[in-house]
């Protein structure tokens, strides 16, 4: 299906084009981005949740952010971002959503306006 396809509306439109009535009996989302229903983890008890379990079953954050622009930060840029300060990147285009990586690790998500990075969220993963 195409992004932003409204199945209920599509069903109603199809029914109207057939000069009939129609409705959706059952609708189930099976995928959102890279997340698929068949990859869902079923947990029967909290005892199952161990560090090894989480490391084995988790999707790496880099895989989730794979289709979003990433910029690599220098030491100075990373320090400024950690302190909540704006910093300038050598990137000309304005970007409404991107992530910044430092030493291969997610540092922050935010936007870029006139080469100035504005953090939306800074992570403490380093």
Curated annotation (Swiss-Prot):
Gene Ontology terms describing biological process: pseudouridine synthesis; RNA processing
Gene Ontology molecular function, alphabetical: catalytic activity, acting on RNA; pseudouridine synthase activity; RNA binding
Pfam families linked to this entry: TruB_C_2 (PF16198)
Protein name, as recorded: Uncharacterized protein RP502
Organism: Rickettsia prowazekii (strain Madrid E)
């Amino acid at each position: 299906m195409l992004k932003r396809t409204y199945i209920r509306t599509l069903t109603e439109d199809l029914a109207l084009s057939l000069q009939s009535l129609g409705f959706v009996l059952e609708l189930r989302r099976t995928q959102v981005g890279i997340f698929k229903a068949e990859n869902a983890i079923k947990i029967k008890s909290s005892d199952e949740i161990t560090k090894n379990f989480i490391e084995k079953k988790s999707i790496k954050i880099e895989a989730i952010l794979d289709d979003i622009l990433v910029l690599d930060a220098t030491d100075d840029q990373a320090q400024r971002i950690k302190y909540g300060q704006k910093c300038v990147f050598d990137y000309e285009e304005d970007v409404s959503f991107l992530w910044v990586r430092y030493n291969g690790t997610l540092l922050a998500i935010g936007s870029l306006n006139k080469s100035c990075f504005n953090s939306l969220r800074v992570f403490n993963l380093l």
